[in-house]
């Protein structure tokens, strides 16, 4: 009987974890992309595959390892409470004008949400800074007197046209790109937004 029980335990231990008992992980679904880049900050927006709590970590672009020291964290929060959801908006502030920074986006899946009573979060996941360099961003200089922006409109969901229009942006580096209107024929879902132009905007402009 003991041998049978021992073999049963060994067999169960060798089985892969059932999806029903495995913890969900929040991965990046779309983005990131930047908005409202000012002399002292910027806003990062992205979506995740499941409800999550999110934050952004920043470091100066000074050649050091991103985690050489503990980096400041900026949370997606409102009135001191962290927002939970699939769409994340994090404002990074307190930066210096005319300086280049690196940033990393992070998120933790919501395992249990009991409202004001308790929220249980899973393991943290984020943009891969081992295989790819952290995302760069440069704050505008305080003494500049001109800027360059590009405007795109009326592509009506033709992502290939959008990519042609902004394809040279990584080389020419406009200060920002204005997405003006009629970029889709209709907006039925977040997926349509990313497939229509936002995925390409994130790839080419971030």
Model-derived features: positions:
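Hydrophobic alpha-helix-in-membranes signature
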Residues: 15-18, 173
């Amino acid at each position: 009987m003991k041998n049978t029980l021992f073999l049963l335990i060994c067999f169960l231990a060798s089985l892969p974890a059932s999806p029903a008992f495995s913890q969900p992980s929040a991965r990046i679904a779309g983005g990131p992309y930047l908005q409202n880049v000012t002399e002292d900050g910027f806003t990062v927006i992205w979506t995740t595959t499941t409800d999550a709590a999110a934050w952004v970590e920043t470091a100066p672009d000074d050649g050091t390892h991103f985690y050489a020291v503990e980096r400041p964290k900026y949370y997606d929060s409102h009135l001191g409470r962290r927002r939970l959801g699939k769409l994340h908006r994090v404002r990074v502030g307190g930066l210096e004008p005319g300086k280049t920074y690196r940033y990393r986006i992070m998120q933790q899946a919501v395992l249990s949400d009991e409202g004001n009573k308790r929220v249980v979060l899973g393991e943290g996941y984020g943009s891969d800074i081992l295989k790819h360099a952290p995302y760069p961003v440069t704050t505008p200089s305080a003494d500049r007197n001109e800027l360059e922006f590009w405007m795109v409109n009326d592509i009506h969901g033709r992502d290939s046209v959008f990519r042609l229009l902004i394809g040279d942006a990584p080389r020419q580096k406009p200060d920002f790109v204005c997405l003006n209107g009629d970029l889709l024929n209709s907006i039925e879902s977040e997926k349509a937004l990313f497939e229509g132009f936002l995925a390409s905007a994130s790839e080419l402009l971030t």
